Amino acid sequence: MKVEDFDFDLPEELIAQTPLLDRTSSRLMVLDKKSGDIKDQHFTDIISYLNEGDALVLNDTRVLPARLHGIKDETGAHIEVLLLKQKEGNAWETLVKPAKRIRKGATITFGDGALKAICLEELEHGGRILEFSYEGIFYEVLEQLGEMPLPPYIKEQLADQDRYQTVYGKENGSAAAPTAGLHFTEDLLAKISAKGVEIIFVTLHVGLGTFRPVDVEDTTNHKMHSEFYRLTEESAERINKIKAQGGKVVAVGTTSIRTLETIASRHDGKLVAESGWTEIFISPGYTFQAVDALITNFHLPKSTLIMLVSALSDRTKILAAYNHAVEEQYRFFSFGDAMFIH
């Protein structure tokens, strides 16, 4: 298929710039994936679509405050560093601006010197392998010095950094939030659990590639960025049991889907304890083996994520739903409203 086939017109004012005061006060569009029927509801109505014996699968990753501002020791030049992926030990793959100022062997100091880095290797497109030195615990130092790397379409400063984290996130490692999970509160999850729905966690660390435009014309030529995932033995067994008993597996977010489908596609539809790196690209024509339904936000035109949701329903129904969302003034992208495809 052509990437252009996944385009739609989106007025800029519908791109949500800030989160709502109450996480659960967002709207929820409910789409029947087979018939294309649409219902306009509120997010708390999601409870009525989840039944006893179903699984609600959430991604428990946490976003790192991964944007750092430092000084090049040799010249005093201001340097911006974005952490992308942890390598061996204290070495990280990073994106550096301006990259031309940081060559192999250059050193950078952040804050009052609590964090330092040396460039080990130069990569293309401004990428650098930096090795960090610090006292104490790296993630605690990062919490003090780092900023949340908000998506490029969000122009406003975030007043409360916790609003770009899910309430249940605990595994540090993402460069972006698994945004479908931002709608849940502990109270809402407790009500869902009380109904007999099993709440199960997976981990996928979201990379910045999630915002990267698709730069090919034909979707079959697109290569996905790689992201780290992990599924525990307990979670795998619980999901397999639910599926065997006829329960639905409802994924919260495209990251949860990508984790489950990566594993299921390798093991004849079964889930097993596994961790590794996935480059799975789900687009129309893909046969889902693990997931029955999806809670997700509204995605960018021509993105791999709108291709994924089109695979779960079909392209025509998804684009019709997106046009309805525009007409009804739904809020789009990371801080926007939600969609339930079932």
Curated annotation (Swiss-Prot):
<dbReference type="InterPro" id="IPR003699">
    <property type="entry name" value="QueA"/>
</dbReference>
<keyword id="KW-0671">Queuosine biosynthesis</keyword>
<keyword id="KW-0949">S-adenosyl-L-methionine</keyword>
<dbReference type="InterPro" id="IPR036100">
    <property type="entry name" value="QueA_sf"/>
</dbReference>
<comment type="function">
    <text>Transfers and isomerizes the ribose moiety from AdoMet to the 7-aminomethyl group of 7-deazaguanine (preQ1-tRNA) to give epoxyqueuosine (oQ-tRNA).</text>
</comment>
<keyword id="KW-0963">Cytoplasm</keyword>
<dbReference type="GO" id="GO:0008616">
    <property type="term" value="P:queuosine biosynthetic process"/>
</dbReference>
<comment type="subunit">
    <text>Monomer.</text>
</comment>
<comment type="pathway">
    <text>tRNA modification; tRNA-queuosine biosynthesis.</text>
</comment>
<dbReference type="GO" id="GO:0051075">
    <property type="term" value="F:S-adenosylmethionine:tRNA ribosyltransferase-isomerase activity"/>
</dbReference>
<dbReference type="GO" id="GO:0005737">
    <property type="term" value="C:cytoplasm"/>
</dbReference>
<dbReference type="GO" id="GO:0002099">
    <property type="term" value="P:tRNA wobble guanine modification"/>
</dbReference>
<dbReference type="Pfam" id="PF02547">
    <property type="entry name" value="Queuosine_synth"/>
</dbReference>
<protein>
    <recommendedName>
        <fullName>S-adenosylmethionine:tRNA ribosyltransferase-isomerase</fullName>
        <ecNumber>2.4.99.17</ecNumber>
    </recommendedName>
</protein>
<comment type="similarity">
    <text>Belongs to the QueA family.</text>
</comment>
<dbReference type="InterPro" id="IPR042118">
    <property type="entry name" value="QueA_dom1"/>
</dbReference>
<keyword id="KW-0808">Transferase</keyword>
<dbReference type="InterPro" id="IPR042119">
    <property type="entry name" value="QueA_dom2"/>
</dbReference>
